[in-house]
C-alpha cells in the first residue's frame, strides 16, 4: 500500500498534470469504488463541469479540490492515476475515467479494486469518515515528541502496531514504521508504554527524518508503485531493514530478521534493536 511519501509524490506529480483542467465527463466502470454519494451516477453528474483547483493530501488520502466539491481518494494497495490522450488504449484494470474538456483523460487504474472515492462539499470532509478520525500529520506542529509520548503511554500494544494506527499519526505503514524503528534502535515488539522519554524523542525525530528523506527520493518502489508520470521511487535503495530479510545489517552485519507483529510482516535487526 502506498504510504505517505508515495502519496505525496503522486500528489505533486499529479498536480503538475491536471491542475486547472476541467472535467467534461466521468465514466465509472467499477461502481464499488465510489463510496459517496451512494449512487455512482450522482458522483459523475456532480463532477461534470468542475475544474481541478488543487490537489491536497491528508495522510494516505488524496484530496482533489474542485470548484464546488472535494474528492477524497484512497489508492489502497494498487491504485494509480495517470493522464492519457483519449485515443490511447486502456485495459480491464482502468475503473474510472475523468475526461477533460481539452480531450485528455485522467484514468484511475487499480488491479486489486480496493481504492475508494468520496465526494464532499468543501469543509465537510474533515468531519466525516474516512478523514474524521485521523491523527496529526508528521510535519504538523502538534506532532511533537510530547504528543507522541502521551499517545504511546496510553497503550500496551507493540510499538509497531501503535505506530501503524492512523489515529496516532497519519501516513505510516509497514515500510516506514520498520525503517524508523530501526533508526531509533527500537525493537518492534517493545510495548509502546514502556519506551523511555529519551527513546521517544529519538523515535519522533526518526519518523520525521525517514518520511522526509523518502519524499525527497520519490517514495519506495518495492512492488508496483509508480508516480503519476510513470516513474518509480528510489528510497528503496536507502532501506536499512524493510525487504532485507537474511541480508546483513548495514550497521553491524547481523542478518536482518522478519517476524509477524500485529499480523504484519516486520523487518528488524536483532542486534541493533534489542527487545526490552
From Swiss-Prot:
Cofactor binding note from Swiss-Prot or TrEMBL: Binds 1 zinc ion per subunit.
This enzyme's EC code(s): 3.2.2.23, 4.2.99.18
Cofactor: Zn(2+)
Catalytic residues (positions): 2 (schiff-base intermediate with dna), 3 (proton donor), 60 (proton donor), 264 (proton donor)
Keyword set, alphabetical order: DNA damage, DNA repair, DNA-binding, Glycosidase, Hydrolase, Lyase, Metal-binding, Multifunctional enzyme, Zinc, Zinc-finger
Alphabetized Pfam families for the sequence: Fapy_DNA_glyco (PF01149), H2TH (PF06831), zf-FPG_IleRS (PF06827)
Domain of life: Bacteria
SMART domains from the UniProt entry: Fapy_DNA_glyco (SM00898), H2TH (SM01232)
MF GO annotations: 8-oxo-7,8-dihydroguanine DNA N-glycosylase activity; class I DNA-(apurinic or apyrimidinic site) endonuclease activity; damaged DNA binding; DNA-(apurinic or apyrimidinic site) endonuclease activity; zinc ion binding
Zinc finger (FPG-type): 240-274
Binding of DNA, residues: 93, 112
Catalytically driven reaction(s): Hydrolysis of DNA containing ring-opened 7-methylguanine residues, releasing 2,6-diamino-4-hydroxy-5-(N-methyl)formamidopyrimidine; 2'-deoxyribonucleotide-(2'-deoxyribose 5'-phosphate)-2'-deoxyribonucleotide-DNA = a 3'-end 2'-deoxyribonucleotide-(2,3-dehydro-2,3-deoxyribose 5'-phosphate)-DNA + a 5'-end 5'-phospho-2'-deoxyribonucleoside-DNA + H(+)
InterPro entries on file: DNA_glyclase/AP_lyase_DNA-bd, DNA_glyclase_Znf_dom_DNA_BS, Formamido-pyr_DNA_Glyclase, FPG_cat, MutM-like_N-ter, Ribosomal_uS13-like_H2TH, Znf_DNA_glyclase/AP_lyase, Znf_FPG/IleRS
GO biological process: base-excision repair
Effects seen without this gene: Cells lacking this gene have a 5-fold increased spontaneous mutation frequency. A double mutM/mutY mutant has a 1000-fold increased spontaneous mutation frequency. Triple ytkD/mutM/mutY disrupted strains show increased mutation rates during both exponential and stationary phase.
Subunit-level organization: Monomer.
Function: Involved in the GO system responsible for removing an oxidatively damaged form of guanine (7,8-dihydro-8-oxoguanine, 8-oxo-dGTP) from DNA and the nucleotide pool. 8-oxo-dGTP is inserted opposite dA and dC residues of template DNA with almost equal efficiency thus leading to A.T to G.C transversions. Involved in base excision repair of DNA damaged by oxidation or by mutagenic agents. Acts as a DNA glycosylase that recognizes and removes damaged bases. Has a preference for oxidized purines, such as 8-oxo-dGTP. Has AP (apurinic/apyrimidinic) lyase activity and introduces nicks in the DNA strand.
Family the UniProt entry places it in: Belongs to the FPG family.
Protein name according to UniProt: Formamidopyrimidine-DNA glycosylase
Species per Swiss-Prot/TrEMBL record: Bacillus subtilis (strain 168)
Lineage of the organism: Bacteria, Bacillati, Bacillota, Bacilli, Bacillales
